[in-house]
């Protein structure tokens, strides 16, 4: 039997050098680590890793080749009260594995035990890691590097975006390949999108609870192998990486960036009753935040929390991010529950992972977007991230909905959100683009559902409608559900137009949820994380071409307005913005706080957004000059020159002079 050589302690993971494979694994508390390789017949061969450099275990297997399946058994104490849960009866996934063979099914053998260890061997059913070799021709691929001020983000799910698209070949619908198909790229280009933000593509597992209900984790926020692509989105799992890179290369050629939603805050091992896949059995005490009683700090709502202040876990997270940039040429990341990244355990701007990213010549050059909260005390950190980060701006989301759908927001508060929430983000040298403005996202109502439902309808999720937020700031316009009279449909359409205009013509970086531009509905489900079905798949055959054209016209209009693309904070008298009342006069202090919901916003001295958010038709006197309504509010071939706008109830219009 071949013996392992000592090998090298870096890089982490399994790496083929043409002659054999070097294996490395971090564990600060292990007493012994076995590499387990599986031959073509599934026969297991075990080798002790002979090298031990600091906390890195390593060994080199001569003559090993790509395609080799492997895992680890890690020996050490079973001391739950101290956070140690070693169990060599369980085969473990390499945290840095690039490919996984097998499924993460709900099986009692994939649990380590709660108070007492479960010593039943699980190698026969446990997923295995696969050694891969990386040869890919990027040709002349170059990142688009779209300036932040020109960035328009489109948040989409790999499968849901194309699974029902009639113009994409059936065999590639819902896959990585479909993202790079000319039909999809042409659509994004015509819409005006500059960055495609994908829900998680790193390999994830469905929670046992969902599997028992016949459901699955659709969104992907339950990671199990952070360096491996989720194989279900590939035409062939063996070629998933190349399919993904082909799509990125095609998108880059069209000038479209790719941003990955990445989950560094928790793992699919969940709470102490959850499955054992990897980190818990490799070094539970190091990888997770552990309470004094040995249980997990659950700052994520998912059962565990990764300890991103531990040096080895920081190295792991940094290596993971670099992998996606260097190997897949992604252009940035959106970090799920990103407050966890700054926990020490209190949140700090100089937390170790933030510092590592800032000091990294690779990661400091890509787009970084934080979901700036977690569920622990002190977890709401909007506006408090380091200057390299942009942040999801929930202030904008709530303000836009309250202004147009609940009618309870003063003009001053609305204007503050329209001006990139400078009260929140104008600090530490940050620019307006730090505010990622959104009206909707994957999490919550779609835009159409915001105007059709007053209440969530999440019964299909199997939790008796208890899951999902109740703070939706939505308005069904008088009837719960889709459909209704022509008048009802028109009022809902006007509200959608108002919300889209507010999103796409505000200062900051706009993010559009895929499907909002053509009227996609989830029938009132505001937490569709477990709905891998027609509820979440975009139905292109039912798409509203009129709404799509309206959205595209707004995006193209945005790109013409210097005050929005120059990415500079607006200052009094600089010509970027003037705030006027219905008589084209500057608003008084009282009007800002208590005045009627009527406002004119003059941008770059040439573009005028006239707003009447009252219940009555109102005459709005435009400023001096020759104004004409512009698309999408008037046909280019028939401009209306006017001095007074008859503002319909809950209406708005954009003019140019």
Curated annotation (Swiss-Prot):
Site positions (Transition state stabilizer): 443
Active site: 336, 371
Key word Transferase present: no
Annotated spans, Disordered: 458-479
Highest taxon above the source species: Bacteria
Known pathway: Glycan degradation; glycogen degradation
InterPro entries in alphabetical order: GlgX_C, GlgX_Isoamylase_N_E_set, Glyco_hydro_13_cat_dom, Glyco_hydro_13_N, Glyco_hydro_b, Glycogen_debranch_bac, Glycogen_debranch_GlgX, Glycoside_hydrolase_SF
Protein EC: 3.2.1.196
Ranges annotated as biased composition (Basic and acidic residues): 458-467
Keyword Iron set for record: no
Record-linked SMART domains: Aamy (SM00642)
One MF annotation (Gene Ontology) recorded for this entry: hydrolase activity, hydrolyzing O-glycosyl compounds
Function statement: Removes maltotriose and maltotetraose chains that are attached by 1,6-alpha-linkage to the limit dextrin main chain, generating a debranched limit dextrin.
NCBIfam families per record: glgX_debranch (TIGR02100), PRK03705.1 (NF002983)
Protein name: Glycogen debranching enzyme
Provenance organism: Shigella boydii serotype 18 (strain CDC 3083-94 / BS512)
Gene (name only): glgX
């Amino acid at each position: 039997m071949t013996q392992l050589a000592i090998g090298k302690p870096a890089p982490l993971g399994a790496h083929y050098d043409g002659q054999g494979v070097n294996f490395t694994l971090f564990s600060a508390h292990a007493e012994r680590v076995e590499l387990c390789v599986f031959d073509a017949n599934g026969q297991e061969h075990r080798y002790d890793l002979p090298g031990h450099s600091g906390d890195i275990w390593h060994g080199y297997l001569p003559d090993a080749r790509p395609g080799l399946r492997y895992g680890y058994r890690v020996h050490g104490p079973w001391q739950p009260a101290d956070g140690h849960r070693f169990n060599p009866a369980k085969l473990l996934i390499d945290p840095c594995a690039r490919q996984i063979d097998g499924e993460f099914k709900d099986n009692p053998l994939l649990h380590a035990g709660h108070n007492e260890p479960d010593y039943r061997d699980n190698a026969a059913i446990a997923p295995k890691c696969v050694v891969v070799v990386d040869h890919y021709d990027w040709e002349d691929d170059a990142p688009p590097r779209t300036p932040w001020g020109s960035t328009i983000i489109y948040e989409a799910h790999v499968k849901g975006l194309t699974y029902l698209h009639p113009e994409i070949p059936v065999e590639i619908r819902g896959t990585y390949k479909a993202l790079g198909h000319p039909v999809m790229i042409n659509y994004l280009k015509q819409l005006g999108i500059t960055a495609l933000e994908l829900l998680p593509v790193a390999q994830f597992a469905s929670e046992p609870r969902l599997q028992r209900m016949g459901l699955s984790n659709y969104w992907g926020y339950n990671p199990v192998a952070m360096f491996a692509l989720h194989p279900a989105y590939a035409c062939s799992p063996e070629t998933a990486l190349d399919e993904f890179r082909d799509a990125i290369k095609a998108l880059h050629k069209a000038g479209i960036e790719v941003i990955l939603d990445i989950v560094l805050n928790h793992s699919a091992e969940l709470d102490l009753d959850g499955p054992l896949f990897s980190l818990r059995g490799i070094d539970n005490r190091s990888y997770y935040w552990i309470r004094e009683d040995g249980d997990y700090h659950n700052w994520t709502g998912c059962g565990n929390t990764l300890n991103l202040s531990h040096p080895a876990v920081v190295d792991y997270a940094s290596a993971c991010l670099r992998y996606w940039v260097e190997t897949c040429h992604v252009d940035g990341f959106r970090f799920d529950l990103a407050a966890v990244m700054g926990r020490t355990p209190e949140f700090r701007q100089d937390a170790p992972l933030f510092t590592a990213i800032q000091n990294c010549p690779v990661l400091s050059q890509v787009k970084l977007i934080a979901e700036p909260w977690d569920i622990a005390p002190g977890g709401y950190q909007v506006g408090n991230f380091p200057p390299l980060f942009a942040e999801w701006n929930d202030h904008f989301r709530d303000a836009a909905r309250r202004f147009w759908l609940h009618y309870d927001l003063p003009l001053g508060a609305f204007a503050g959100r329209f001006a990139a929430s400078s009260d929140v983000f104008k600090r530490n040298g940050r620019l307006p683009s730090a505010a990622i403005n959104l009206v909707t996202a994957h999490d919550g109502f779609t835009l159409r559902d915001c105007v059709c439902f007053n209440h969530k309808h999440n019964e299909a999720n199997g939790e008796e409608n208890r899951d999902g937020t109740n703070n939706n700031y939505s308005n069904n316009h008088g009837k719960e559900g889709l459909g209704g009279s022509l008048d009802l449909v028109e009022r809902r359409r006007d509200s959608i137009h108002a919300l889209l205009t507010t999103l796409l013509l505000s200062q900051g970086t706009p993010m559009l949820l895929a499907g909002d531009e053509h009227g996609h509905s989830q029938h009132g489900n505001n937490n569709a994380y477990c709905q891998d079905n027609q509820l979440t798949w975009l139905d292109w055959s039912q798409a509203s071409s009129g709404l799509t054209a309206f959205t595209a016209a707004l995006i193209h209009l945005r790109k013409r307005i210097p005050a929005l693309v120059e990415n500079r904070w607006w200052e009094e008298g600089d010509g970027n913005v003037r705030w006027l009342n219905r008589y084209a006069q500057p608003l008084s202090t009282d009007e800002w706080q208590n005045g009627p919901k009527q406002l004119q916003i003059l941008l770059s001295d040439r573009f005028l957004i006239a707003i009447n958010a009252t219940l009555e038709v109102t005459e709005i006197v435009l400023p001096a000059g020759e104004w004409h309504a512009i698309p999408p509010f008037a046909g280019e071939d028939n401009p209306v020159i006017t001095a007074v706008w008859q503002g319909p109830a809950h209406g708005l219009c954009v003019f140019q002079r």
